[in-house]
């Protein structure tokens, strides 16, 4: 039985991980988890899976829960995330927290040689060089949870990376894929949150609509698979059935297919190198689907993807600045402070003004992250 620590338990990926853990009790045991402010979901997880350690966002919630559950240890805040990540009993850490807050706790778990199932794009985007160097140093395994990177990982299994011609990451196009840039001037938050294929959290659904999500995934693929940017392509694929493809020198293309269900890559990262049956999984019926559609990526239609490639090729702290600007701009859009098209514009303005540091340490990354968010807050007032 594998013992699991979970960061970001009450978010979209975390809750789907919980769904797997409660159905696969013979395979996995949850020993520690972190949650935010959702006490209803936190209590449900405690009641169902009885972990040893729980971290919440606020101290008052931790004190309240400690009275209700005297046999469980409760902690809170940023230090609580590190405690969950480094729980001595767990061998696998699922990092499903949103944004760059998962960085320090992930590095702490890596230094203990744990297997990291990483669903937190921002950790790899802002500090990929640190994460992979530390993983190599401490012999920690990094497994992708994103459906696209899981697909690439599976399509590379048993192959020599030197034989790869290119990685092809598929993109649904998001909630506005049939709209022109001109039509996007007046879209609402509710419009943007209506994703055609996937059930995801608000931030990633907006990122999907701007295509920044795919940009982050391109950078993530570069980091995880040590692949140059000129060998990473993005292909529009409306149905989200082919999750990604790997093309080899001999023109062979290996792809991973399946119905759009995030539990599949989550469970694969947990059970790897084994596969176990998925509870209530929907089997793929290609005859029923009938047709799959593909289009070349339009970088003018999706400037956020162009910006992500630019930041990736430049490297250094511009990756942190781009990511922090995006997170802050998306939050401003969700709060009704800026329009949808101003998300891209805000990111570009931040990137143009940024003074890049080529090989940043952790402290520099965190400082740039914090400063960039303040800059965007001032811009959107």
UniProtKB/Swiss-Prot annotation:
InterPro entries: DXP_reductoisomerase, DXP_reductoisomerase_C, DXP_reductoisomerase_N, DXPR_C, DXPR_C_sf, NAD(P)-bd_dom_sf
An example Gene Ontology molecular-function term: 1-deoxy-D-xylulose-5-phosphate reductoisomerase activity
Gene3D superfamilies tied to this protein: 1.10.1740.10, NAD(P)-binding Rossmann-like Domain (3.40.50.720)
Disulfide bridge partners, by residue number: none
Keyword terms: Isoprene biosynthesis, Manganese, Metal-binding, NADP, Oxidoreductase
Membrane-spanning residues: none
Record: residues binding Mn(2+): 146, 148, 217
GO biological process: isopentenyl diphosphate biosynthetic process, methylerythritol 4-phosphate pathway involved in terpenoid biosynthetic process
UniProt feature coiled coil, ranges: none
Positions annotated to bind 1-deoxy-D-xylulose 5-phosphate: 121, 147-148, 172, 195, 208, 213-214, 217
Uppermost EC category: oxidoreductase
Catalyzed reactions: 2-C-methyl-D-erythritol 4-phosphate + NADP(+) = 1-deoxy-D-xylulose 5-phosphate + NADPH + H(+)
Cofactor(s) named in the record: Mg(2+); Mn(2+)
One Pfam family recorded for the sequence: DXP_reductoisom
Pathway: Isoprenoid biosynthesis; isopentenyl diphosphate biosynthesis via DXP pathway; isopentenyl diphosphate from 1-deoxy-D-xylulose 5-phosphate: step 1/6
Residues involved in NADPH binding: 10-13, 36-38, 120, 122, 201
UniProt-listed SUPFAM superfamilies: 1-deoxy-D-xylulose-5-phosphate reductoisomerase, C-terminal domain, Glyceraldehyde-3-phosphate dehydrogenase-like, C-terminal domain, NAD(P)-binding Rossmann-fold domains
EC number: 1.1.1.267
Domain of life per record: Bacteria
Glycoprotein listed as a keyword: no
Record's function text: Catalyzes the NADPH-dependent rearrangement and reduction of 1-deoxy-D-xylulose-5-phosphate (DXP) to 2-C-methyl-D-erythritol 4-phosphate (MEP).
Family that this chain belongs to: Belongs to the DXR family.
Annotated protein name in UniProt: 1-deoxy-D-xylulose 5-phosphate reductoisomerase
Organism: Lysinibacillus sphaericus (strain C3-41)
Recorded name of the encoding gene: dxr
């Amino acid at each position: 039985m594998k013992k699991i620590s979970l960061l970001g338990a009450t978010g979209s990926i975390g809750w789907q991980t919980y769904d797997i853990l409660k159905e696969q009790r013979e395979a996995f045991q949850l020993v520690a988890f972190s949650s935010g402010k959702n006490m209803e979901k936190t209590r449900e997880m405690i009641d169902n899976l009885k972990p040893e350690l729980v971290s919440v966002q606020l101290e008052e919630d931790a004190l309240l829960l400690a009275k209700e559950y005297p046999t469980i240890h409760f902690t809170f805040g940023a230090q609580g995330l590190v405690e969950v990540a480094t729980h001595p009993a767990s061998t696998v850490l699922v990092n499903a927290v949103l944004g760059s807050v998962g960085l320090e706790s992930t590095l702490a778990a890596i230094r203990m040689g744990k297997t990291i199932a990483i669903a937190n794009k921002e950790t790899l985007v802002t500090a990929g060089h640190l994460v992979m160097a530390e993983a190599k140093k401490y012999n920690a395994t990094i497994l992708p949870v994103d459906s696209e990177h899981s697909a690439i990982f599976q399509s590379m299994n048993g192959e020599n990376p030197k034989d790869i011609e290119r990685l092809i990451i598929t993109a649904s196009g998001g909630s506005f894929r049939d709209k022109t840039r001109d039509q996007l001037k007046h879209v609402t938050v509710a419009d943007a949150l209506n994703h055609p294929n996937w059930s995801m959290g608000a931030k990633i659904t907006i990122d999907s609509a701007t295509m920044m999500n795919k940009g982050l995934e391109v950078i993530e693929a570069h980091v995880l698979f040590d692949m140059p940017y000129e060998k990473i392509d993005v292909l529009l694929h409306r149905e989200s059935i082919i999750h990604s493809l790997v093309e080899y020198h001999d023109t062979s293309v290996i792809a991973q297919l399946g119905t759009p269900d995030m539990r599949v890559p989550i469970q694969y990262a947990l059970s790897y190198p084994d596969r176990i049956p998925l509870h209530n999984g929907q089997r793929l019926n290609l005859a029923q689907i009938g047709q799959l559609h593909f289009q070349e990526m339009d970088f003018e239609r999706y400037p956020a993807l162009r910006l992500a490639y630019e930041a990736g090729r430049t490297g250094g702290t511009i990756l942190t600045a781009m990511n922090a600007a995006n997170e802050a701009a998306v939050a401003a859009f969700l709060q009704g402070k800026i329009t949808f098209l101003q998300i891209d514009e805000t990111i570009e303005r931040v990137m143009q003004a940024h003074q890049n540091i080529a090989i940043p340490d952790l402290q520099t990354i965190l400082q740039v992250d914090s400063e960039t968010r303040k800059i965007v807050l001032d811009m959107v007032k």
